[in-house]
């Protein structure tokens, strides 16, 4: 479940698409996923389990260039390894995260 999605201030050094590792990781309930878009893009962020099944869709929207952070709550997910995937036009990247209970 997404708690909040908000643009954050972008530094001049942030050029190009970039997906950061979620923090904290591992986590029990709440984590933050940050990514940067160099241009206005159609963005989709999903969470999958270790079998590749989509367990949550965090966002599917057009976003302006800049840096963004999503606050993600894993309260409804069991303990385990999950992946978050960011797709923005021609960019696609994924990271692993660990949910503790």
Go through the PLM ranges and name each one:
Residues 2-8, 71, 75, 79-101:
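C-terminal tail/sorting-segment detector
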Residues 3-47, 69-72:
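Glycine-centered coil/turn sites that cap beta-strands in beta-rich domains
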Residues 21, 58-62:
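Beta-strand-rich interaction surfaces with strong enrichment in secreted/lumenal proteins
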Residues 37, 62, 74-76:
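Residue-level recognition of secondary-structure-to-loop junctions
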Residues 40, 65-67, 77-81:
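Extracellular Ig-like/FN3 beta-sandwich strand-entry sites
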Residues 42, 67, 92-94:
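Short, mixed charged/polar active-site loops
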Residues 49-51:
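Residue-level recognition of short loop/turn positions
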Residues 53-59, 93:
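Surface-exposed loop/edge segments in extracytoplasmic proteins
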